Amino acid sequence: LAAATAVVMAVTGTALTSSAATGAAGEEGTSPGGRGAVDLGRQVLGADDGWGAANGGTTGGSAASAEHVSVVDTWDELRAALGGAGARTDTTPRIVYVDGRIDAFAGTSCEAIAATVPVAGSDVPFSMDDYVAAYDPATYGWVDPAGPLEDARAAAAAEQATRTLQHVGSNVTIVGLGADAQVVGASLRIRDARNVIVRNVTFSDARDCFPAWDPGDGDAGNWNSAYDNVSVWTSENVWVDHSTFDDGEHPHSSLPTVFGRPFEIHDGLLDITHGSDHVTVSYNHFSDHDKTAILGSSDSRTQDAGKHKVTYHHNRWTDVGQRAPRVRFGDVHVYNELYEQTREGIFQYYWGAGVDSSIYAENNAFELAAGVDPARIVARWKGERLFETGSTVNGEPVDLVGAYNASVGEADRLADEARWTPTLHGTVDPTWAVPAIVRSSAGAGRLGPVDAPAYDPHATYGAGDVVVHDGAVFRAQWYARGATPGAAWGPWEELATNEQGVPVWTPTRVVRAGDAVVHDGAVWVARWWSRGQEPGAASWGPFRAVG
């Protein structure tokens, strides 16, 4: 953990009004870097930043005492820092910094877990191969699995849960150090909690070693897995920000087909269920996953009515199949999202209007693969309404609810309305600017802290090397030796970002066509390559203002 002692925050410049995180008053946490750098562990959700700002706001572990501030680089350390087995009911303010790659499967494997579970009536340990052979519908029939092998699968699944599932309690902030903070193979469950912040971490591949076969799920059966990368259950005031969610080394495209169905080892990337409320999901990147982000666990949970109030904004969804999000019961604000397809792949729909839901969608950008009908963006799951405005598909305005309604019968149509009008939000950016802003800002590694050595005037640097000088972070554009970072011209580019991760314009920053930058409190998008040309300095130039 020695590297953690040299952490330098690169969060500088003017905060965007659309999502201004603020420091916790009265708490230590300003980094020694100066220049307005802020300790991400002490930041709290801005006062108007979505539903998470209601109900008293979301401050996470910002009030943590020094003894409850941890830097972790192993799965065991992370679990202990969160409170271990007692985390679910723990309310101690905590800040947990994730340093580097943490693998919940380090030192174990699916096979090793299975080997601990014998099949009743034999000395043979459980294996999924035996399970598949035993319950093949061609020989076993289309009935639920039962008997010693199913019992052993359930026991193996329970054993896995003790190893790779970790609860997160109340008043907690989990934040990644630098650009390489990653949690692999684990499922973090924020359950029965209040006031939780998760930022700047890549969550990958929360795989289920022992998915269950359900022949009655759908027309052809399905394999169902138990783990989300991050899940929010029966919790309130949660902020998930600037994180990346994916399937890691086991993307959906790599899964085999068993019994004619994908052998699904993942559930959701970020599911919010069981009456959770007042959640903001901002500047995240979701990619290469099927069932991505469901909001609400069951149509039958009528006790969830009036809850599931969630804001999604400035998130990036790349090659996801469905549920982006799918909503039950909630009043959900979805704005300035970027949906992009590099291939049609597993795509089914993006917005799912579920029972008693009310989605208010504005200024979202879609980049669909060739031949994908915009009418497929919306799907109805017993919902009655979905308000949408300002959407573009491949750069052109499209009435998405109108397109959906034109593609279905009258009984399945949606009213283009919401039962409320959002008031808790920052600036809603124009749709044309969304791709540049989101691509520049969303995902882990876009915020500090940044681990980097101090600039040495006697050292030799190559293109891409990162250093710290006078409290700022710089990257070499080409070979450098003896050239001081910060000069108006030279090899060094300053890597300042605002608190949402949007780059701050500096005279040394290289800006390329389509890049978004912040300057004088406004966001600007570059028309072409530039360096040293100040946004707004002339009536015509490389930048146009977003807001």
Regions found by a protein language model. Give the residues of each.
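Long, ordered, amphipathic alpha-helical scaffolds
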Residues: 359-450
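Right-handed parallel beta-helix
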Residues: 170-180, 194-207, 228, 234-251, ...
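Secretory targeting and sorting signals
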Residues: 1-23
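Extracellular beta-strand-rich solenoid/capping regions of secreted or surface-exposed proteins
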Residues: 80-91, 106-173, 181-199, 208-214, ...
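Low-complexity, acidic Ser/Thr/Pro-rich repeat tracts that form intrinsically disordered stalk/linker regions
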Residues: 20-38
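Tryptophan-rich substrate-binding surfaces of secreted polymer-degrading and adhesive proteins
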Residues: 448-547
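Acidic Gly/Asp/Thr-rich repetitive segments characteristic of extracellular carbohydrate-active
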Residues: 47-97
